């Protein structure tokens, strides 16, 4: 036994067991997130339950089965139910009934013993709406310009409404949004000239005429927008809900109409793919509990890229100074200790520092120096995407410094001496020999920085992230990239939907879907950086020997 321990074999097996447990845990977590997240997009079967309630009344419940659970019979002694006395538990179903304008909650529990009949009618319709969630029921009538039309016209009407909605969105965001932006810029220009005492009568008249012209364009676009909305609002669909009520739904509020129970496997697969595409390309709705997450995807990727651009040169330059130029003295040792300790500081502390120093001090000073015309409304003196990127750059700076130093220390000193002996300066040696060989280690530091920054939420809540951003940081208005704007983030979106949602049951699958998307983005960013690192490593492998 002693000989076996001395051979080192137990430690090899122990290490292998640790790696296996870690790998199984990671794969299990990914499987859990993927299975529950992807189920959010699969078209569910819509059931009709004929049942008897506690008062003995017959009623019908239409919806999709969201969850099942067993409860003790002892909790139901107050109900007059025909229950098998030998049973200890009873199954109950959580049904998503939708129709939020008719009932206060779009979920309800029903007991299996109360169900008298369960069917899957093929003519049940699921209507995905912009407000009030899904509607489940039967089509009674389709009205076009006040006249009833055949049900076969449904797809044609939906396509027409979709085209109108696209035109409305284009008018609102691109045309009307651009005019509003120019009017605001002109107002600030007038204010700036007033503060500088350079507003001449001629300049004031010119700016006034410019605003008048923009307002005239705005009126034309506003009339066109109203005309489009009138075209969209004239078509309606009359539905019959599960309680027999007739409900009129305007086509302008409809996103999609589907007969889930009629769909074949390939039909459901096609809808599954289309719903994933809509999830990653649409804006959120209904307090982030429905719709897509495109603004959050855009904000996450943009913030990570800005952070990478900031932290890469800072970390590499700091590592080069500490390893190549700084002497081995007490100050250098103190700096290394400080860098290592920074990696252990809680992320929320960085958020507080970013809010107090960058936002209030630096941003407030920038506003007073360069944006006085906007005061008291702050420009950079408020949380935004730039301060978020800088704060996370400081948070991940120790990772890049340590990784780069490790790469520099592995380069043989003979290569430095040989370069200097051939007449190269220290700067030329550093630029042409040292940095190319150390580039894989630099990329490793950047990979670790991206992985940590993409998942951080706590500091971002203080320095720039919001629940709903009205505008993206990147648009068609000069200067195109607006670093002062707030942004959405997938990590914060998960927290907001999971813990701040008014409808927890509806938001639960969305939490898993968003988490799966965040993991996918982080993996994609890391794999891109890893591929670059591997190419650099192969390119300079021969120089290391």
Feature-to-residue mapping (PLM):
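Interhelical loop and adjacent transmembrane-helix boundary motif
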Residues: 287, 464-516
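Membrane-topology segments of multi-pass transport proteins
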Residues: 1-16, 20-28, 34-288, 544-545
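Membrane-embedded alpha-helices of multi-pass transport/permease systems
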Residues: 313-318, 349-352, 387, 394-415, ...
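Membrane-interfacial helix termini and adjacent extracytoplasmic/periplasmic loops
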Residues: 271-291, 350-394, 464-466, 473-481
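Transmembrane alpha-helices
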Residues: 401-405, 411-412, 426-464
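Transmembrane-helix boundary motif in ABC transporter permease subunits
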Residues: 307-339, 352, 529-538
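C-terminal transmembrane helix and the adjacent membrane-cytosol boundary/short C-terminal tail
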Residues: 326, 405-413, 420, 447, ...
């Amino acid at each position: 036994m002693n000989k076996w321990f001395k051979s080192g074999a137990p430690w090899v097996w122990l290490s292998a067991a640790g790696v296996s447990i870690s790998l199984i845990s990671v794969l299990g977590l990914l499987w859990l997130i993927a299975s529950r997240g992807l189920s959010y997009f699969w078209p569910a079967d819509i059931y009709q339950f004929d049942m008897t309630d506690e008062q003995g009344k017959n009623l019908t419940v239409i919806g999709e089965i969201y969850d099942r659970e067993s409860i003790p019979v002892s909790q139901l002694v107050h109900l007059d139910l025909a229950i098998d006395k030998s049973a200890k538990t009873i199954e109950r179903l959580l049904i998503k009934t939708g129709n939020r304008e008719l009932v206060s909650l779009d979920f309800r529990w029903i007991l299996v013993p109360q169900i008298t009949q369960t069917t899957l009618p093929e003519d049940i319709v699921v209507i995905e709406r912009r407000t009030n969630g899904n509607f489940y029921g039967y089509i009674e009538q389709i009205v076009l310009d006040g006249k009833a039309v055949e049900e076969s016209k449904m797809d044609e009407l939906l396509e027409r409404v979709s085209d109108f909605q696209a035109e409305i969105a284009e008018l609102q965001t691109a045309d009307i949004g651009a005019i509003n932006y120019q009017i605001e810029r002109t107002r600030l220009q007038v204010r700036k000239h007033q503060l500088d005492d350079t507003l001449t009568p001629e300049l004031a008249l010119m700016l006034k005429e410019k605003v008048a012209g923009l307002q005239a364009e705005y009126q034309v676009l506003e009339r066109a927008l109203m005309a489009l909305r009138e075209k969209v609002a004239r078509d309606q669909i009359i539905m019959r809900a599960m309680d027999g009520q007739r409900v009129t739904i305007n086509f302008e509020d409809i996103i999609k109409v589907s007969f889930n129970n009629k769909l074949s496997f390939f039909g459901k697969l096609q809808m599954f793919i289309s719903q994933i595409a809509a999830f990653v390309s649409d804006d959120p709705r209904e307090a982030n509990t429905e719709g897509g997450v495109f603004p959050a995807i855009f904000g996450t990727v943009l913030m990570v890229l800005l952070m990478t651009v900031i932290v890469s040169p800072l970390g590499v330059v700091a590592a080069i100074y500490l390893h190549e130029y700084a002497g081995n003295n007490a100050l250098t040792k103190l700096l290394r200790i400080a860098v290592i300790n920074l990696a252990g500081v809680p992320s929320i502390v960085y958020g507080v520092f970013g809010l107090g120093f960058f936002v209030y001090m630096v941003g407030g000073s920038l506003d007073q120096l360069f944006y006085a015309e906007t005061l008291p409304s702050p420009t950079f003196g408020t949380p935004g995407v730039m301060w978020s990127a800088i704060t996370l750059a400081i948070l991940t700076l120790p990772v890049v410094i340590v990784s780069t130093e490790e790469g520099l220390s592995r380069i043989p000193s003979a290569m430095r001496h040989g370069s200097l002996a051939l007449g190269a300066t220290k700067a030329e040696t550093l630029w042409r020999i040292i940095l190319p060989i150390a580039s894989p280690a630099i990329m490793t530091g950047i990979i670790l920085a991206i992985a940590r920054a993409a998942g951080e939420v706590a500091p971002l809540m203080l320095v720039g992230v919001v629940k709903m951003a009205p505008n993206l940081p990147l648009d068609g208005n000069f200067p195109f990239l607006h670093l002062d704007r707030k942004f959405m983030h997938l990590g914060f979106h998960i927290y907001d939907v999971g813990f701040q949602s008014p409808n927890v049951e509806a938001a639960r699958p969305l939490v898993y879907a968003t988490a799966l998307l965040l993991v996918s983005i982080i993996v994609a960013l890391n794999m891109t950086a890893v591929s670059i690192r591997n190419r650099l490593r192969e390119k300079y492998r021969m120089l290391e020997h």
